[in-house]
């Protein structure tokens, strides 16, 4: 059995599922992440919701993990996922991460953007009509800071 490589913290913040991703990730990590993500997103199924993905360190996906993340993201769109904001400020591999995630999200009918700060992500998503719980965002950021 292979072990998960990579870590994450997932928090629901209003209409957003916020993920702090520490990479690189392998497919076992993506599988574990998908289970945790689904648990947090289930209350949003049937209405439109969004993601904020904050990446830290070598935020890379090995090829089979990239494919699996694409499949998992595609499965969320019919359930209501419509927008993804990726926060790159703490990534040490920004260009590669951006290229990988563009491939991952391309053609999935999910609008996505890349920003530097979580505040920029919140602003972009609020501008698209999402209700982002700022208190939950603060708690998520505090949880990340204490890791």
Task: Describe the predicted segments one by one.
Residues 1-147:
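Amphipathic, Lys/Arg-enriched alpha-helical "gate/interface" segment within cytosolic domains
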């Amino acid at each position: 059995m292979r072990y998960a490589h990579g870590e994450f913290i997932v928090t629901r913040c209003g209409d957003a599922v916020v993920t702090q991703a520490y990479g690189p990730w392998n497919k076992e990590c993506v599988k574990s992440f998908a289970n945790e993500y689904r648990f947090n997103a289930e209350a949003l199924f049937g209405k439109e919701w969004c993601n904020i993905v904050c990446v830290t360190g070598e935020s890379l996906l090995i090829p089979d993990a990239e494919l699996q993340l694409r499949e998992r993201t595609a499965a969320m769109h019919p359930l209501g996922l419509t927008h993804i904001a990726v926060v790159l400020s703490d990534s040490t591999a920004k260009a590669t991460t951006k290229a990988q995630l563009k491939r991952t999200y391309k053609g999935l009918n999910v609008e996505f953007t890349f920003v530097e700060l979580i505040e920029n992500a919140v602003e972009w998503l609020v501008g698209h009509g999402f209700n982002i719980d700022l208190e939950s965002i603060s708690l998520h950021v505090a949880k990340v800071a204490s890791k």
